[in-house]
Amino acid sequence: MLYRKGAVEGEVPSFISNFTSSLKYDRKIAKATVKVVMAHIEHLCEINAINTNICHKILEILKELYGGILEKYPNGKFEDIHEYIEYYIINKLGEDVGGYVNLGKSRNDQVATAIRIVLKDEIINLLEGIIKLQHTLLNKAKEHVETLAPGYTHQQKAQITTLAHHFLAFYDALDRDYERIHGSLERIDASPLGSAAMVGNTIPGYDRAKVAKKLGFSKIVENTEDAIASRDFILEAIFNIAILINNISRFVEDLILWSMNELGYVVLPEHHVATSSIMPHKRNPVTLEVIRAKTAKVLGYATSAYALLRSLPYSYNLDLQELTPILWKIIDDCKEILAVLSDLLSRVRFNEERLLKSVSENITLCFSDLAEYITLKYNVPFRKAHRVLGEISKRKHITLHSISEYLREKLSVDIKERELEEILNPIHSLKRKTVTGSPNPKEVRALINKRIKSLLDKESKLSRLRSKS
């Protein structure tokens, strides 16, 4: 080990070095770390802190390492990727040249910078995944603007909606997730480099903002202690992703329930189901079940991340190296979930006949419409109309005639059967709902068009952001 020569000496037993080493997790930031070292060395050369010849030699080795570090990834006794990079350079150039590589920086600011570089890129990957899923949802919504479906509250049929309206509800939740995750980029996009261990360096002319610009950052983390101690940008990203995952889990649970034989609203794509080893008739929703399980794990990871940072004293502690594997795992799981769910939704079929039967066979799904109608037309207090219709709903057999008779008896209102048929018709029920955001097909089409335009604009902006990263 390169760093065990000085205040700390001697070989460390492998079971100890393996325990404290982050090398197996550092592969994710390996190229970014080389990039950070290159920017730092270039700047040291620019301000004449090191000899130009030495600088060029180090940069040559770094370029070589950048192109092949993943293929040459170490499996020896190194504390982390940072020690390995310095060891590699010194081993190639000797200490008289390679020994300058860590001048003015520390592993502390180096790792914090590399994490932010990779996280920026991964956030963009996630945002692209959300956009793809949103495109799929809008396409499905366009197909099912007039496909009636039962809306549920308390897992019981409540009112009549459409599949398109349901898809747009999930779409809008994803939109908020997108904005939250995108917003975290502002806090991530700040360079810690030049903060060294925690108080900066003594090199005359070292310009942290200039080095930040080399690395694609828009600004620096100004306070040098905050720069190396802070991981709240990771927590922010993790919890924003956890909210996204939670929203996904709710929609996925709907699909699982809808695929049950008892409901049969959904026919899942062939490659998203599996059969039983003993029951030949089974079509198990396996990908949705794995998504559901992974969403639970993400919440566990998020809790671990919070607990890891809770009460951790300033400034740097090696506890922090246990945080980044959690971050990468959450991101990898989320990207996978977005891709799998997008594929499933693009191929899923809905049993429109079963959905229509589900809403048509239950006349009470339009009783809230009828209560409003009675109040508005006959000036009957809504609570009174609500109570009387609730009494009707308890009956075993409900017909238009029995409704008309009971309303006449209890409320002294004369609503003919033909009039009731119109009010309680599922399609007419939707068309009467003219408030913004309702499942009225006309309103839903307007919502879809508005979101198509917004999504294309969002996609264009993200593409420009990707080109800068």
Language-model features and meaning:
Residues 57-58, 225, 388:
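Residue-level "edge-of-site" marker
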